[in-house]
């Protein structure tokens, strides 16, 4: 499984990489990479690790896409000059990564054990082993609970200064 990849690496890289591999008797059950989270970072990791022939497995969770699934217009992502709806962009990212071999399971990770190699990822009571774990679980907004906040989301109340700051250029704003 790794031999085609290893033959192109410098010998010092191979020796360092092999130090982290589990014993040969359990190699068949060990993934090279498990990705936890299915937003833009997760799918980018999936795309690149799949193209590197590392046979990645992604656990996307039951609500993959994160905050972008609630975003109607994304205008600051390269490749979409007219903007794109968040859910549509997530479909595009998933399709592209899967085209190169990313395996996606829409399941939630319950636990990760980093105490020894290979690492253990528990999903719905089942243990998965991997040499590397990429955690790309994203972020979540913290709301104040202020009066009128819910009604004004997306109409002047924003949770992403770098995303929405452009819309408030030359205006008076409050940042909490």
Predicted regions and their residues:
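Conserved Rossmann-like nucleotide-cofactor binding loop
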Residues: 41, 63-64, 140
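N-terminal Rossmann-like dinucleotide/flavin-binding domain of flavoprotein oxidoreductases
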Residues: 69-127
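Short beta-strand "acidic-cap" motif of Rossmann-like dinucleotide-binding folds
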Residues: 55-61, 68
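N-terminal amphipathic/hydrophobic targeting modules at extreme N-termini
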Residues: 1-2, 6-8, 12-15
């Amino acid at each position: 499984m790794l031999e085609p990849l290893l033959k192109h690496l410098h010998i010092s890289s191979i020796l360092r990489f092999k130090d982290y591999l589990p014993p040969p008797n359990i190699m068949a059950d060990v993934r090279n990479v498990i990705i936890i989270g299915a937003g833009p970072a997760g799918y980018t990791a999936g795309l690149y690790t799949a193209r590197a022939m590392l046979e990645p497995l992604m656990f996307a969770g039951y609500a993959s896409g994160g905050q972008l699934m609630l975003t109607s217009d994304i205008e600051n992502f390269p490749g979409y000059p007219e903007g794109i709806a968040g859910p549509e962009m997530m479909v595009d990212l998933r399709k592209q990564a899967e085209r190169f071999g990313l395996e996606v399971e829409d399941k939630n990770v319950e636990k990760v054990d980093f105490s020894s190699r290979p690492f253990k990822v528990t999903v719905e009571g089942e243990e998965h082993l991997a040499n590397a774990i990429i955690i790309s679980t994203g972020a979540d907004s913290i709301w104040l609970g202020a009066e009128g906040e819910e009604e004004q989301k997306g109409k002047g109340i924003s949770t992403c200064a770098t995303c929405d700051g452009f819309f408030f250029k030359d205006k008076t704003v409050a940042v909490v």
